């Protein structure tokens, strides 16, 4: 595609925080799809490598870390420079999403991020209990800010591939499933209507089911963590507690599972790191696989969004929802090495598009427990297709950067929506913008269940009355 649409004009400054793998991939999409004054675009990152890359693209660059102490002094002049509404694109680690979001809104600037990120030190603070380090707790801080200051300038929270795009996939998958099950009616337009549809369809749960098969042209070196996206981000979330949205149909809970005393009540966490917690899941390419139950915002937000409550406010329906992530093989080996040694590797490396020889990132949602058993809907984006349609990123990165693009388009078209999550956005508009960057987007039914081939040669603690119980999904051997 050579005739790319220019969606809108951004009249004010564009301030991009972070220029790692996602920032470098997002910048060319901003340049391609928006009209703006190039002199008003600035990138902020503490890395000298990032400075060289930004300057090579002719972009103004500030080599500085955004911290709790300097963020106001640094960002306010940039976001308010000259006429027009500013746009803050926060793609960094170790910067408080909430603080920067509120600062942007105070100054009338639009805002978007891909995660509810805390300030540096939060993830590895030994004084914080597991519950305090959870994504549930981080999300609740954003929800509290929305309650305290409803409406106002739009800020889109958690709008990458996942969290983000997968929330739009869930809605499309529900629409497809309804059609295939012969359930008629108007397409939902409210949260309550979407939740009722999921309940009426009998969806017991949703896996964010992903398989990354991208391979490098060289073997993983010893004591180097290799991944296809931010190693810092993956390690940080991987060492948070495993978390999931907890469905109303579940009859068993792990002994080390804990709930929350406040907030939406949609999630639980386990007293173990997500990147060392395995679950059984399925994607079209790998088919049955083990994935890591890494905590993600969408595990809680989707479960919360699809909750049906009675007149007394009690949840009568909620699907279980969690990530089931099989990263690239080098990252799996890196996790094994990290947990085995009991410490982080001395170095890390993000595989870029020039180092990957082949593979896809197959990322979608697996809706299960309904009348057709299980339905996977998602993107099968290859590295070859990625190179053809977008510069400076691999397949994993493009699924994220194109979701940021879609969220920016939605924010510009809805500039006074207040604080929103990806679940709140118009999924059709967002997928209209994003789909050209996703490769094949497919829906596949499967008769696989977590009880396939079980029990095997050894006795297992399983629930044969309901294959989709979390008791059967969680790998406990």
UniProtKB/Swiss-Prot annotation:
Quote the EC number: 2.5.1.44
Q: Which positions, given as ranges, span the membrane?
A: none
What catalytic activity is recorded? 2 putrescine = sym-homospermidine + NH4(+); putrescine + spermidine = sym-homospermidine + propane-1,3-diamine
**InterPro entries, per database record:** Homospermid_syn-like_C (IPR023181), Sacchrp_dh-like_C (IPR032095), Sacchrp_dh_NADP-bd (IPR005097)
Q: What is the required cofactor set for this protein? A: NAD(+)
Instruction: Tell me which UniProt keywords the record has, alphabetically.
Output: NAD, Transferase
Mention one GO molecular function.
Answer: homospermidine synthase activity
**Cross-referenced Pfam families, in alphabetical order?**
Sacchrp_dh_C (PF16653), Sacchrp_dh_NADP (PF03435)
Query: What is this protein's function?
Result: Involved in the NAD(+)-dependent synthesis of the polyamine homospermidine from putrescine.
Q: Would you identify the family this protein belongs to, as annotated?
A: Belongs to the saccharopine dehydrogenase family.
| Subunit annotation | Homodimer.
Q: What is this protein called?
A: Homospermidine synthase
